[in-house]
Each structure stands twice: as C-alpha cells, then as structure tokens.
C-alpha cells in the first residue's frame, strides 16, 4: 500500500474534485480517500464509489456508532459509501489563568457559560472589566469569546431550537430559516461581535487565545491539541491553565451536539482492489488500532465498544503511550457523556458544500465588516451611532434578505 498526503482534508477534497472534473494534470482517484460527506456524496453521484456493504457484514457494521455509520448512507437503497474512521464534536476551551482573575474580580461563574446567551452576557461583562483597567483609554475592552466553524453555529443552533436548517428529502433541500430563530443567532453572535465582545483574528480561535485576543472559544474536540500553554503578545508572555467545558447551547433548547469528521471512501475499481481497501479499513477501525490513533489525534473512536474511557486507559497503559493532557481530558469528558449525548449532523444534498459555506462566511463576514466600521469611528458618539446602525432591525432585515438569497443561489435550481 502507498499513502499520499495532500495537506489538509480540504486540499484532498480539492484534488478529488479536480479528478472528477477531468482537470488537466489531475491525478486519478486513489483506491481509498479521506473525505467529508459532502464531497463523497458528489463523487457517489458520479457513480465512482464502491458500496461498502458488499465487503462488510451486517454484524460488522452494527459495531459502529449508529449515527456515525448512518452518515455514509447517501441513498434509499441501503448502500454504504462512506465509513467513519474518526469523529469529533465541539467543546468549549477556556484560558483558566485569565478567567480566574476576571471571575475573582466580578463574581462570574463557569456555570454562566452553559448557554450561548450566558456567554454573551459574560463577554459583555469581560469587555467592560478589561476596558476599566485603563481608565485613561476609552473603548479598549477585550473580546472574551470566539468560535470555529460558523456553519456549526447555524446547524446545531437551529437544531437545538427545534429546526433543521437543511431539511433534505430525496437529495433536495428545503431551507428552514425562520426569521425569528435566525434573529436569535444574529443577536448572539453578530451583535456581540460588532460590539467587540467576540472576536476572530487568526485561522483558528486557539490562535487567538495564544495572542491574548480572547480567553474562551467553541471548537472541535481535536482542537485541544492546539490550545496554547502560554499567552504570547508583543510585550509579554505568561503560562496559562485550561478548562474544558461542554459547548454552550441555545437557552431553552435541546442539548444536541455537533457530529463531524471525515470518513473514508473506496473508489470503484475491481474486486481485488475494493476488497483490499475494505480490509484495510476494517483493520484501521479495530478497537485497539482506532484508540491508538485517537491518542495521537484527539478524535473520537468510531466503534461503540471503543467509546469507553476504561478501554482508552487500557490502551494507554499497555502501550506506554504519552497523551496530550488537554486532549485526554477532553476525550474523557466526551466519553463519559457519550451514552447520553444526542449527536447531530445534516443530511447530504446537491451543492451542500456550497450551502454550508454560506453558513460559514455570510454572517461572520458581515460582522467583521461592521466591527471594522466601529473601530474606525473617530469618537464615542460616532462609535455608538455606528453600533446602533449596524445592529438595528433594519440592518438585520437587510442581512437576512441577502443571506436567504445566498443560500438559494448556492444550490441553484433543484
């Protein structure tokens, strides 16, 4: 077997798309490739993927976490096209060192961070508290929070409020974008971002924790590997501790958690190559092998029996494996809550990748543009006026109309 790295999964997906479209210089599809469901679905629509049920028995497939394996069934004929190999969900990570200073001064509690609305309230308090540290300089408060993967904010936020933002039937999507519910998402991300309570500067929010620009974020469980051990700014550096919390939910909503992570697809070829590819996937997802991979990656195992902290501890002890402390604590937390967790991910549909990108960038780009407008204000009165304008009902209506149009344009005629 030969393996090839294309950098990130996104880079690999680009290479797969180029292979499908026959781009000049593109390589043939590999026997096995890592893929998110959106891309694998597009490849399957071109009839290029192997139905894995030809090589996996019902008994073998029953060992995988139900919601994970269901993600790979793209059609109504019980054909399986994507096998889960590692998954993740979202958690909240906090710079404990700076949180403790703030909490001691203001009486704030980690319990307040259980809901998105609570995060917004704490973030406002944090901004005002840090602003007060420099009484001779106005409006220099610091942001408290950020989040990775804005699409997850929409998808899981709407699900927690009782709606599927992408409702799919027969590969066709209906957008459930109830204006009042979307307004709640706007009020709890866009508005605090514009006011400076939230922020996003680096590629990932763990980068922003490292530079001291925020002290808390919602991100993938695998991001714990990258949570910094210290804050480094232009004029200081100091060590920090950490806290791992459940990702906040919409107040009053159901406690659904994001299910995410790439799977493995097998390209249609001949029986020999397809069989060998599936045997490799069986080996890779065996409990012991999968748990060893989890130790190195921070992802979650895909077999039911492997999602057990005792099984992980056994593998670590027997193999004398060194595991990142933050990643271990995060995985332990998720595993201990696994049986009671409701995971959720969207179903696949044509142009789903493009629609998801609208969720990823539409609101966050608008918030970033408005925040820059606020920062450019020349005085306090101008600043207040800009914030009022950018966060008004009229501003929301204008954004909402553009957001709705962008989603429709992303999927085209269905």
Predicted region positions:
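Short, solvent-exposed loop/beta-turn-alpha elements that line the ligand-binding surface or hinge
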Residues: 54-65, 108-112, 138, 144, ...
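Glycine-centered hinge/linker elements that transmit conformational signals in sensory
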Residues: 120-127, 168-202, 242-247
């Amino acid at each position: 077997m030969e393996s090839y790295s294309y950098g990130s999964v996104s880079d690999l997906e680009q290479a797969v798309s180029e292979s499908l479209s026959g781009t000049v210089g593109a390589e043939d599809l590999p026997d096995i490739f890592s893929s998110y469901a959106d891309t694998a679905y597009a490849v399957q629509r071109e009839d290029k993927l192997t139905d894995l049920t030809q090589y996996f028995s019902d008994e073998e497939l029953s060992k995988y976490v139900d919601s994970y394996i269901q993600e790979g069934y793209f059609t109504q004929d019980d054909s399986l096209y994507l096998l889960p190999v590692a998954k993740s969900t979202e958690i909240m990570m906090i710079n404990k060192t700076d949180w403790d200073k703030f909490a001691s001064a203001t009486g704030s509690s980690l319990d307040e961070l259980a809901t998105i609305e609570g995060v917004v309230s704490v973030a406002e308090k944090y901004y005002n508290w840090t602003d007060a540290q420099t009484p001779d300089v106005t409006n220099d408060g610091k942001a408290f929070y950020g989040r990775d993967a804005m699409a997850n904010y929409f998808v899981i936020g709407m699900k927690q409020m009782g709606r599927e933002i992408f409702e799919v039937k027969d590969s066709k999507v209906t957008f459930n974008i109830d204006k009042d519910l979307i307004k709640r998402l706007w009020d709890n991300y866009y508005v605090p971002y514009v006011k400076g309570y939230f922020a996003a500067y680096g590629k990932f929010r763990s980068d922003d924790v490292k530079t001291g620009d925020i002290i808390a974020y919602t991100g993938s469980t695998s991001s714990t590997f990258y949570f910094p051990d210290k804050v480094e700014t232009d004029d200081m550096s100091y060590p920090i501790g950490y806290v791992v919390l459940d990702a906040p939910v919409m107040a009053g909503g159901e406690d659904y958690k994001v299910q995410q992570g790439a799977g493995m697809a097998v390209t249609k070829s001949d029986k020999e190559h397809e069989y060998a590819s599936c045997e490799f996937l069986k080996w890779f997802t065996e409990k012991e092998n999968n748990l060893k991979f989890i130790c190195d990656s921070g992802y979650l195992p895909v077999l039911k029996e492997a999602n057990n902290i005792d099984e992980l501890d056994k593998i670590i002890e027997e193999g004398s494996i060194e595991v990142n402390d933050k990643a271990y604590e995060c995985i332990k937390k998720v595993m201990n809550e696994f049986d009671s967790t409701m995971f959720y991910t969207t179903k696949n549909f044509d142009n789903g990748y493009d629609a998801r990108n609208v969720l990823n960038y539409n609101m966050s780009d608008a918030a970033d543009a408005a925040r820059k407008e606020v920062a450019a204000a020349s005085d306090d009165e101008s600043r207040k006026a800009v914030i009022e304008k950018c966060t008004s009902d009229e501003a929301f209506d204008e954004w909402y109309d553009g957001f709705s149009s962008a989603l429709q344009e992303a999927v085209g005629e269905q």
